C-alpha cells in the first residue's frame, strides 16, 4: 500500500489539477461561486530558483492560487510577464481557463524525470521552490498523449506542510474570506 501524505493523497498519485487564468482573483471567486471550492491561498510572484523552459533559463514571473475540495488540490496560474513559458504554450492552443497539468507527488524525483525522458518526453519547465527548502518541480510535456502536462513535485516535510495547511483551510470553511494571502 502507498504511503498516504498528510493532505490525504497517496504518494505517487495525482495530487493536484491546474488551470491557466487571465485574472487570478476573479477566477478564484468564480470557482468558489460555481464549484464551492475555497478558500484560496494566493501566492504572488512565486519564488523559485534555477528555473528553465525546455532547458533554457527563464525569468517567468507567475502567481498561483491553491484551494482544496476533499483531498484534491486545485491550482490557478497567472503569468505576469511575456516570456516564452509552458502556460502560454497551452493558452495559445486552448485559451484562458483551460486545463494545464496534473501534479504528481514523488520521493524519487530524479528517477521519475529519467523515466519520462526515457519514454521520449521532455522537461518543459523546471525549478527549485525557495519557500519549501529548494524542493524541485518538473513539468513533463505529455500533451501529445494525454492533453496535459504532468508536474512532478518533490515531496518533503515542508512541501507536505504547505499542502496540508491549504487543505486545512478548506475544512469547515464558512464560505467567507475567499482569497487569503500568507502572513
Stretch-by-stretch model annotation:
Residues 1-15, 19-41, 54-121, 134-135, ...:
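Glyoxalase I/VOC metalloenzyme domain signal
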Residues 41-45, 127-128:
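Conserved catalytic-core motifs of GNAT/GCN5-like acyltransferases
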Residues 45-51, 120-124:
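Short Pro/Gly-enriched beta-strand edge/turn motifs at strand-loop
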Residues 48-50, 130-133:
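A short acidic, often aromatic-flanked loop/helix-cap motif at beta-alpha or helix-coil junctions
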Residues 128-129, 138:
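Short proline/glycine-enriched turn/loop segments at secondary-structure junctions
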Amino acid at each position: 500500500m502507498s504511503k498516504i501524505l498528510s493532505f490525504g493523497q497517496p504518494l505517487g498519485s495525482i495530487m493536484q489539477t491546474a488551470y491557466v487564468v487571465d485574472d487570478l482573483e476573479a477566477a478564484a471567486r468564480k470557482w468558489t461561486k460555481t464549484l464551492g471550492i475555497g478558500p484560496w491561498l494566493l501566492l504572488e510572484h512565486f519564488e523559485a530558483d534555477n528555473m528553465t523552459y525546455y532547458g533554457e533559463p527563464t525569468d517567468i514571473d507567475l502567481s498561483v492560487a491553491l484551494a482544496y475540495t476533499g483531498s484534491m488540490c486545485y491550482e490557478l496560474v497567472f503569468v505576469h510577464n511575456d516570456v516564452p513559458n509552458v502556460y502560454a504554450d497551452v493558452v495559445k492552443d486552448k485559451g484562458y481557463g483551460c486545463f494545464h497539468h496534473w501534479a504528481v507527488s514523488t520521493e524519487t524525483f530524479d528517477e521519475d524525470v529519467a523515466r519520462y525522458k526515457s519514454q521520449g518526453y521532455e522537461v518543459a519547465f523546471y525549478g527549485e521552490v525557495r519557500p519549501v527548502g529548494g524542493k524541485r518541480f518538473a513539468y513533463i510535456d505529455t500533451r501529445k498523449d494525454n492533453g496535459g502536462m504532468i508536474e512532478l513535485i518533490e515531496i518533503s516535510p515542508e512541501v507536505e506542510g504547505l499542502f496540508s495547511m491549504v487543505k486545512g483551510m478548506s475544512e469547515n470553511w464558512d464560505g467567507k474570506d475567499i482569497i487569503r494571502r500568507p502572513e
